[in-house]
């Protein structure tokens, strides 16, 4: 399930934590040591924990669960957007709006507005408006697309959150915990792993390292979805139809 090697993590700098003076003591069990006042993360712990995460999300995906990808810092935005789209999961890559989970009913109204504006634009209705009105609606559409475009088709609260940098995204984590939504999080040496259900100890500032974590999660989700499809096809193909004119069993594949 986990297709990443120790060498790949090392080359991406996944083992580099933060400066020792900024460390969180609760991360001590994941720290190998320090070099030049920088904490070194023990990748021998990261690798199996990343494997646990991929196994978990694969099981979720096989059961058609929704996993919300969250990464709004510069090092995570591109990877979050690219891989979430690739595996068909909702994502937040711009700015976490307070209440995005805990006040989802209100957020859903904004999503309806986003869909309404997109439909109006696709039908060319903006072209029939006066320039000022069309410009205002275009700006509103762009703002909503930037903030909510990634969760436009989420269709309700997610079944789990996958977060890059649990400190930076602490509001998202707090909202998920309040709603008892499981949290998967990349945790660097300056943050606490408390209240994170599935911890990935690792550098959350390296774009290459972040891309590895997110890619692995997305790959596992796709594997889970595929296993669900294969299982369904296999189950269908095992259906036996018995006819009154024959004693033979025929397998009917749909």
Swiss-Prot record:
Segments passing through the bilayer: none
GO terms of molecular function: structural constituent of ribosome
Keywords: Ribonucleoprotein, Ribosomal protein
GO CC terms in record: cytosolic small ribosomal subunit
GO biological process: translation
Entry keyword annotation includes Ribonucleoprotein: yes
HAMAP family tied to this protein: Ribosomal_uS2_B
Family to which this protein belongs: Belongs to the universal ribosomal protein uS2 family.
Name this polypeptide is given: Small ribosomal subunit protein uS2
